């Protein structure tokens, strides 16, 4: 019998189990939908943030519900999605453009100056180039919440993830 460590080190155990659960497709509904089914859509967090305690509580409660339905033998789908959060995304990308233009600016008022400069640069770029820049930002940063939920072990079927700006 191996010794049980005195201190729990989640980083040495949890990623392995999370990968196993995904590899075994435990969170995917069966193709055979002849039995009872249960599904919920993930209330879509937006791409601009990180999970906060409210998300954690809500996702834990939903995860418990989804697992309970699976244990009852139901075919369960927890469908994930992300919201584009256009206004928040615009503000973040504008601030990023401002920071790039004013890299040495620090201290009080820097954030406001970055935002103003970013707005000026957005207008200078035009809508097409700015939208392209927003898509680049989304590709680089939009998966933060997904990674956090995966780390928590949320029983979501990520193979079906949707984004509010996905083509229909």
Could you tell me what each predicted segment is?
Residues 1-168:
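N-terminal, positively charged nucleic-acid-binding surface of large information/translation enzymes
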